[in-house]
């Protein structure tokens, strides 16, 4: 009986979502010293980069954020997705 109860407890612990929340850098700069906790349902860190043309010439832009899905890359837009805390490179 004790073995059955212990087995049940182990199965419950393994199967339950224990409230883990993803930590991602969320900013629009090349370096992000701090990370933020992603909201529920957004368990992917996304880094988008592109070149924006402004009055002073082209400039590389970067945006880091939490997301529910990994968006596709497009012409002129590079997307990097990862699923571990602060996993940008």
UniProtKB/Swiss-Prot annotation:
CDD domains: TFP_snake_toxin. Coiled coil: none annotated. It is found in: Secreted. Keywords: Cell adhesion impairing toxin, Disulfide bond, G-protein coupled acetylcholine receptor impairing toxin, G-protein coupled receptor impairing toxin, Hemostasis impairing toxin, Neurotoxin, Platelet aggregation inhibiting toxin, Secreted, Signal, Toxin. InterPro entries: Snake_3FTx, Snake_toxin-like_sf, Toxin_cobra-type. Expressed by the venom gland. Its main location: secreted. It holds the Pfam family Toxin_cobra-type. Residues 1-21 form the signal peptide. The keyword Transferase does not apply. A motif (Cell attachment site) lies at residues 54-56. GO terms for molecular function: toxin activity. One of its GO terms (cellular component) is extracellular region. Disulfide bonds join 24-45, 27-32, 38-66, 70-81, 82-87. Exhibits M2 muscarinic acetylcholine receptor (CHRM2)-blocking activity, but has a weak binding activity toward nicotinic AChR. Moreover, it inhibits collagen-induced platelet aggregation. Belongs to the three-finger toxin family. Ancestral subfamily. Orphan group V sub-subfamily. This is Long neurotoxin homolog NTL2.
């Amino acid at each position: 009986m004790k073995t059955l109860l212990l087995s049940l407890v182990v199965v419950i612990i393994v199967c339950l979502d224990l409230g883990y929340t993803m930590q991602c850098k969320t900013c629009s700069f090349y370096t992000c010293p701090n990370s933020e906790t992603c909201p529920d349902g957004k368990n992917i860190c996304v880094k988008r980069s592109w070149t924006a043309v402004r009055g002073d010439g082209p400039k590389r832009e970067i945006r880091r954020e939490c997301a529910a899905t990994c968006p596709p890359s497009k012409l002129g837009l590079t997307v990097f997705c990862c699923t571990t805390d602060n996993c940008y490179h």
